[in-house]
């Protein structure tokens, strides 16, 4: 099983995602506990998901039951929401996340988007008045303070373009360990992966299956004919082919299913490989970004177009 393999930074290659529509604390607590029992060790949450508390409860329960010896066996990622992306709000925001998790530290703390909003703005839809300019240096200096205080073992970003990473690296004292972005066979991120590899930044893939069923997701990945043909010829599911492809790129992946059979299937990425011919066929899939982040773009806000948000990398 692939859940145990780790990156150089000690992050398990496969993590369980917990972004859900609407709070569902009890089902999440039960699903996370079951995931720990079947081998998951990496759990991905965020202040914005409102799933930190049930993850913390499941982790505590897993320690009590002996499913893990201690919290240290788990790798917990959380994220700074846009309304707290201000110099004086970053450390307090992480402390609140830690209270929610009932933990003393997170293994990884990410800037969720390169976006700042007025304090208190949590739920879409957002208006132009909600956005304020993103002071990357101020936010990152506060993220570095989280690391120095021992509240976050590692720090990183999410949804950053090559250009934004270049800017961040120009002044960061502690460079980002991870950039968590959308990666799947329909949005392969070749340019960003090459850039991150050259800078020692680990790419972590969210929505490796295209996030079908979410408000912004798409069927484009699971319905791709090439992937369906490869899956049929190999006796695998389309999901397994997608996850194997992402895994072979060297990325970490965040998978989300609360169904036990699927949770097990999503761990089965090793023990087989795509052939060179299959990889070439996947490389030819027409590319289009699924999670555009349109809600962060406003004609009177800091990002007036998707081109500006992604620096043309779409």
Curated annotation (Swiss-Prot):
Organ and tissue specificity: Mostly expressed in root tissues, observed, at low levels, in mesocotyl and embryonic roots, seedling roots, crown and seedling leafes, mature bracts, anthers, pistil, caryopsis and embryos.
Decide whether keyword NADP is in the record: yes
| Region Disordered: start-end pairs | 1-21
- Source species, domain of life: Eukaryota
Which residues are involved in binding substrate?
A: 112
Gene Ontology CC: one annotated term: cytosol
Q: What class of enzyme is it?
A: oxidoreductase
Assigned EC number: 1.1.1.285
How is this protein named in the record?
Answer: Deoxymugineic acid synthase 1-D
Source species, please? Triticum aestivum
Native organism taxonomy? Eukaryota, Viridiplantae, Streptophyta, Embryophyta, Tracheophyta
């Amino acid at each position: 099983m692939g859940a145990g393999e780790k990156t150089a930074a000690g992050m398990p290659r496969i993590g369980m995602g917990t972004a859900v529509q609407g709070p569902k604390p009890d089902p999440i607590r039960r699903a996370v506990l079951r995931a720990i029992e079947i081998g998951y060790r990496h759990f991905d949450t965020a202040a914005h998901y409102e799933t930190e508390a049930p993850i913390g409860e499941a982790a505590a329960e897993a320690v009590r039951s002996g499913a893990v010896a201690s919290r240290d066996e788990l790798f917990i990622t959380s994220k700074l929401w846009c309304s707290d992306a201000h110099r004086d709000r970053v450390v307090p925001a992480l402390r609140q996340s830690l209270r929610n998790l009932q933990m003393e530290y997170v293994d990884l703390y990410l800037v969720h988007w390169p976006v700042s909003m007025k304090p208190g703005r949590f739920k879409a839809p957002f208006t132009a008045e909600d956005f304020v300019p993103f002071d990357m240096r101020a936010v990152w200096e506060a993220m570095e303070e989280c690391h120095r205080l021992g509240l976050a073992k590692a720090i990183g970003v999410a949804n950053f373009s090559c250009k934004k990473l270049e800017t961040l690296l120009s002044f960061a004292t502690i460079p980002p360990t991870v950039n968590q972005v959308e990666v799947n066979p329909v949005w392969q991120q070749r340019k960003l992966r090459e850039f991150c590899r050259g800078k020692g930044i680990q790419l972590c893939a969210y929505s490796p299956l295209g996030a079908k069923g979410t408000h912004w997701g798409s069927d484009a990945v699971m319905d791709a004919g090439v992937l369906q043909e490869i899956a049929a010829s190999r006796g695998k599911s389309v999901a397994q082919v997608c996850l194997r492809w992402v895994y072979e790129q060297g990325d970490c992946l965040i998978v989300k299913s609360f169904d036990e059979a699927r949770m097990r299937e999503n761990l089965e990425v090793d023990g087989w490989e795509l052939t060179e011919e299959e990889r070439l066929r996947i490389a030819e899939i027409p590319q289009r970004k699924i999670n555009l982040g349109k809600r962060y773009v406003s004609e009177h806000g800091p990002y007036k177009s998707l081109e500006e948000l992604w620096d043309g990398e779409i």
